């Protein structure tokens, strides 16, 4: 299994949680094709809304990829994004700053936001566990069950 971070504004994350899906890189399929069923995906939201929301800098959702291939949907005639289904866990929005020292994927703690410019990227098991334990309560279950 692979662990991923997807950088997405909170309003878009909330839509995905309600619909039990994720998109990446403004609906492009490339990174979604690299994901496999069972992969963990953590959502980091730099802002509350895209494009002009307030700064947030928090992890806003976590779940596992629940399908085998990306699929395309029509949101509007000129926008047909690619998606993956996700089984989301119940979790608490978690500010990133208290976790910075423990996250190994952030090599330069002074410029910690740089990595998120890539949109979607892999993290190791240690970093997933740091984030998951901060976000998920002991009684967490798959959202919507």
UniProtKB/Swiss-Prot annotation:
Matches recorded under Gene3D superfamilies: ph1033 like domains
Pfam families the record matches: EVE (PF01878)
Organism, scientific name: Mycolicibacterium vanbaalenii (strain DSM 7251 / JCM 13017 / BCRC 16820 / KCTC 9966 / NRRL B-24157 / PYR-1)
Highest taxon listed in the record's lineage: Bacteria
Family: Belongs to the UPF0310 family.
CDD domains linked: EVE-like (cd21132)
NCBIfam families, per database record: PRK02268.1-1, PRK02268.1-2
Alphabetized InterPro entries for the sequence: EVE_domain, PUA-like_sf, UPF0310
Official protein name in the record: UPF0310 protein Mvan_0064
């Amino acid at each position: 299994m692979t662990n991923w971070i997807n950088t997405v504004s909170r309003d878009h994350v909330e839509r995905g949680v309600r619909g039990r899906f994720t998109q990446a890189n403004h609906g492009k399929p490339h990174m979604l094709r690299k994901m496999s069923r069972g992969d963990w995906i953590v959502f980091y939201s730099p802002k509350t809304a895209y494009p002009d929301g307030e700064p947030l800098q928090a992890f806003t959702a976590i779940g596992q990829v629940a399908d085998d291939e990306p699929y395309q949907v029509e949101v509007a005639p000129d926008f047909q994004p690619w998606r993956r289904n996700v089984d989301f866990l119940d979790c608490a929005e978690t500010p990133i700053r208290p976790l910075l020292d423990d996250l190994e994927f952030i090599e330069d703690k002074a410029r910690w936001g740089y990595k998120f410019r890539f949109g979607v990227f892999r993290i190791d098991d240690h970093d997933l566990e740091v984030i998951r334990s901060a976000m998920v309560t002991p009684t967490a279950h798959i959202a919507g069950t």
